[in-house]
Amino acid sequence: MAAKIKKGDKVVVLVGRDKGRSGEVLQVIPKEDRALVRGVNLVKRHQRQTAQQEAGIVSKEAAIQLSNLAVADPKDGKPTRVGFKVLEDGRKVRFAKRSGDVIDG
């Protein structure tokens, strides 16, 4: 199946502790149906001291289920579903079903 959410997309969280927050997708993990989103689903990690870093408690993003995310509409930033269409020049692109705007390309 084609990827509806890709790295670099602006997404909105639909459910959970961070409902309504938005951010950029840093990484998609297709085998687990999860994604890392900047500034969303932050957890505290206890960091061991290394040569480059000192010890302490660090906040970092944890993976979130793809079903809990929706792509933000390029026009108004609200959550939208994603569709696919083929342009006249033969390229297959994703578009926002809410506004009809092309997401990539």
Curated annotation (Swiss-Prot):
Record carries keyword Ribonucleoprotein: yes
GO molecular function: rRNA binding; structural constituent of ribosome
Cellular component GO terms held in the UniProt record: ribonucleoprotein complex; ribosome
Gene3D superfamilies, alphabetized: 2.30.30.30
UniProt GO BP: translation
Short name of any one Pfam family annotated for the protein: KOW
Subunit structure: Part of the 50S ribosomal subunit.
Role, per record: One of two assembly initiator proteins, it binds directly to the 5'-end of the 23S rRNA, where it nucleates assembly of the 50S subunit.
Family per record: Belongs to the universal ribosomal protein uL24 family.
Descriptive protein name: Large ribosomal subunit protein uL24
Organism ancestry: Bacteria, Pseudomonadati, Pseudomonadota, Alphaproteobacteria, Hyphomicrobiales
